[in-house]
Regions:
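Bacterial N-terminal signal peptides
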Residues: 8-17
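Flexible, low-complexity junctional segments that flank or bridge functional domains
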Residues: 21-302, 306-332, 401-403, 459-461
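Gly/Ser/Thr-rich loop/hinge elements
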Residues: 29, 311-363, 367, 398-403, ...
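Structural recognition of the beta-strand scaffold that forms the well-ordered cores
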Residues: 256-259, 302-305, 331, 359-364, ...
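Extended C-terminal subregions enriched in glycine
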Residues: 359-381, 386-393
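Low-complexity, Gly/Ser/Thr/Pro-rich intrinsically disordered linker/tail segments
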Residues: 423-462
Length: 462
C-alpha cells in the first residue's frame, strides 16, 4: 500500500508473499491465542533493513543499519510507521516473506540464529550518531541518486564538515533536511518533534501545490474545483461519494466521468492498514465501479480523472485498471535496491464485473503522484487509453520507513516501479499524449474544465 492521502494521511503498505512448495501457504502470525510457531525466531530483510524478532509474546521490529541496530517504535507519525506484519509465507527452512496485507508486497526475510550482537536498546542519540545512521540508511536503501542527479557522497562530505557535537536539535534537523532537499523526492521526508513543535522536511511537490498554497489556499481551491465539476461540467445526476474521495457522473449523456482524489479512504469504520479495512476498501470500490460502468455502457468514452490524485493503496489501483481491459496484461514490475531482477510482477486480470474498453482518457497533472501514477502507467499501455493533461509528479516508490535513534522519523524511496518495457519513470514522471495543464497559473480552477473540454474536442473527430 502506499502514499499521501488528501484527507486523512494514508500510505501504501508494502511487503510480500510467496511460497514454500508448489503452492504458497500464507498463515496468520498472530492467532487469537498464540503466535505462529513457524514464524517465531529472528528474521532479517536486507532489502528493507528490518529485523523481526518474533516470540510467543509477539513481534519486535528492529532497524538494521550499517551504523546501528535499534528497536523500531510502532507509533510513527505516518501509517508506514504504525502498521505491523500479519502474515507469514515460508519459502524454505531459512527464508520467508512477511506481509502487512494479503496480495501486496515483496520483501524477503532470512532466518538468523540470533539477534546480531550490535543490536541494542541503549541508543546513542548524539548528533554524530543520528547523522551516521541517516547517511547509512540512504547509502544502503535510496534508489534514485542517479535519476535525480544528486552526488550523495559530495552531499555527505559537505554536511559532515558542518556537523558539531554541540548542535541543537533544530540545527541538526536543518542540516539533514538540507541533504534531502536536492533529491526533490516527495516520497522522501524527515519528521521531528522539536521543543513541542512538529517539523516536516519534504520536497519535490511539483509546481502546482506550492503555488496554490501560496495563493488561493488548497482547501478553497479544492472546493472550487469540486463545485465546478459537479455543477458546470457534469450532468445533473453527478455524485460526490465514497467519503468525498470520488466524483462520478456523465457529460452530455455520452461520456462517463470518474475522478479519484485518493486510491482508498472510501470507508471509515475500520482502522487503516488492517485486513478488514483493505477488504472494505476494495468492496466499496467494486460497488462504485459496478454502478458507474453499468451507467457508462455504450457511451462514447470514459474520462478517468487523476489530475488531483494523491495516491493510496496499490490494490485499489490494480482493481481500477482491471475495469478497462478484456484481456490480462502485465501492469508493472517492482525492483528493490540493487536486485538485478524484479522482485514482483503484477498481472492485471479483467474484472468480473462491468468493464469499459472503448476510448478512455486519463487526465493527469503534477499533482498526480504515487498510486495515481501507477494507475496511469498501467492504463496507458493499453491501445484504447490516451493520457491527457500535464506530466505526473514522478514519485512512485512506496516510502520505506526508518525511525532514527533520537525518535525522528525518516521515509525514503527504495523501489523502482517499471512498465512492460522495463522503464522506471521515477523523477521524470509520465508525459501525456495530449498536453494541456489542468491547473494553469492564470486559471487554476477554470483550467480544469478547459482540460475536460479539450478531451471532448479530441473525442469528436473519432
Amino acid at each position: 500500500m502506499r502514499r499521501r492521502f488528501l484527507i486523512p494521511a494514508l500510505l501504501t503498505l508494502v511487503t510480500s508473499a510467496s511460497a514454500c512448495a508448489a503452492e504458497p501457504v500464507r498463515q496468520d502470525i498472530l492467532g487469537e491465542d498464540s503466535v505462529l510457531a513457524a514464524a517465531q525466531g529472528v528474521w532479517r530483510s536486507h532489502e528493507s533493513g528490518w529485523i523481526l524478532e518474533i516470540d510467543e509474546d509477539g513481534i519486535t521490529r528492529w532497524q538494521d543499519t550499517p551504523a546501528a541496530c535499534y528497536p523500531s517504535p510502532t507509533d510513527g507519525p505516518t501509517l508506514m510507521g504504525q502498521i505491523e506484519y500479519r502474515y507469514f509465507t515460508a519459502i524454505s527452512a531459512d527464508t520467508a516473506r512477511f506481509q502487512y496485507l494479503p496480495g501486496d508486497g515483496h520483501a524477503r526475510f532470512e532466518r538468523l540464529d540470533a539477534l546480531p550482537a550490535h543490536c541494542t536498546a541503549n541508543l546513542d542519540t548524539s548528533p554524530q550518531a543520528v547523522f551516521d545512521v541517516f547517511v547509512s540508511v540512504f547509502e544502503r536503501h535510496y534508489a534514485f541518486f542517479d535519476a535525480r542527479g544528486v552526488d550523495w557522497p559530495a552531499q555527505v562530505g559537505t554536511a559532515r564538515r558542518q556537523l558539531r557535537g554541540d548542535m541543537s536539535e533544530a540545527e541538526l534537523f536543518d542540516l539533514l533536511a538540507g541533504m534531502i532537499a536536492p533529491l526533490g523526492d516527495s516520497h522522501t521526508k524527515l519528521i521531528a518533534q522539536i521543543d513541542g513543535e512538529r517539523r516536516r522536511a519534504q520536497f519535490g511537490l511539483g509546481d502546482t501545490l506550492p503555488r496554490i498554497d501560496a495563493t488561493l489556499g488548497e482547501t478553497p481551491w479544492l472546493i472550487g474545483l469540486i463545485q465546478q465539476t459537479v455543477t458546470d461540467v457534469l450532468d445533473e445526476d453527478a455524485q460526490h461519494i465514497a467519503n468525498d474521495r470520488i466524483i462520478t457522473g456523465t457529460i452530455d449523456d455520452r461520456v462517463g466521468y470518474l475522478q479519484f482524489f485518493t486510491m482508498g479512504g472510501f470507508v471509515t469504520e475500520f482502522e487503516a492498514g488492517t485486513p478488514q479495512w483493505a477488504a472494505a476498501e476494495l468492496a466499496a470500490l467494486d460497488t462504485i465501479m459496478d454502478e458507474a460502468l453499468t451507467q457508462f455502457e455504450g457511451m462514447d468514452a470514459v474520462i478517468l480523472d487523476l489530475s488531483n490524485n494523491r495516491g493510496g493503496y496499490d490494490a485499489v489501483c490494480r482493481s481500477i485498471a482491471s475495469r478497462f481491459t478484456d484481456a490480462p496484461f502485465l501492469g508493472y514490475a517492482v525492483s528493490v535496491g540493487n536486485e538485478p531482477e524484479p522482485v514482483a510482477r503484477y498481472t492485471i486480470e479483467p474484472a468480473e464485473g462491468p468493464r469499459f474498453t472503448g476510448p478512455v482518457y486519463v487526465l493527469t497533472s503534477d499533482v498526480t503522484v504515487s498510486c495515481g501514477e501507477i494507475t496511469t502507467m498501467m492504463l496507458r499501455q493499453l491501445e484504447h487509453v490516451t493520457q491527457v493533461g500535464a506530466t505526473t509528479r514522478g514519485a512512485f516508490s512506496t516510502p520505506l520507513a526508518k525511525p532514527l535513534p533520537n525518535g525522528w522519523y525518516l521515509e525514503l524511496s527504495n523501489e523502482r516501479f517499471e512498465d512492460t518495457s522495463g522503464t522506471a519513470h521515477e523523477a521524470r514522471g509520465l508525459e501525456p499524449d495530449i498536453a494541456i495543464h489542468p491547473f494553469p497559473e492564470d486559471s487554476p480552477v477554470a483550467g480544469h474544465a478547459a482540460a475536460i473540454a479539450a478531451i471532448l474536442a479530441d473525442l469528436d473527430p473519432r
